[in-house]
Amino acid sequence: MRTTLLSPADYRPMPWKNGLGTTHEIWVGRTAHDEATGGFRARLSIATVSVGSPFSRFAGCDRIIVLLDGAGMRLDSGPGRQQVLSQPHQPYAFSGDWDTDCTLIEGPCRDFNVIVDRQRARAEVRVISLSPPQPATLTASPQDDLWALFVLQGAATVSDPDQPPTSPPLSVQREHTLLCQGSEQAPLLRRLQVSAEGGETRLLWIAIRTPEATAADTGARP
């Protein structure tokens, strides 16, 4: 397993696909074919929404967004597909096939984005609240090949409960991301133990998995 700790300085700024906004790319999973075509298997990013505008369309993809800060936005994807995102840290899943218009409630806001090619991946997004000293243990699905922990509030200590206690834990600060990526040669850890560092802590836990996982196990389908 490969573990990478990223700070906001590592996130790559880029324009939205439709050119109407800005996103900071945290991680993207691409093959050589994707590099040539501009596609991807999965992507994690933070978008800054400064004005109301249409969202970029991602045909064949499932999306999950989480409001990080600001008053929020209203999303209109057609009849029966309206959603108000005004409460931070509440995941909302919808289809990238939809034409979605965004109206800001009051001023700019930011949101965390998970996008997966539904033919090649599924995503699960959970919000985890921690209070010291009680830790939480995260357990992998057999289909998981990437985990990401993004700290929404506070700071977290992350360790492998199956390793000797002498193994040093990792400290993950607010808006930093811990990526844990498995491969055939080095599978993903089955468990992670997460604790709050000194105060109330809130995390986004994102799992990217192969499509063999059932829809009931994922949060990616609208």
Where are these regions (language model features)?
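Jelly-roll (double-stranded beta-helix
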Residues: 1-222
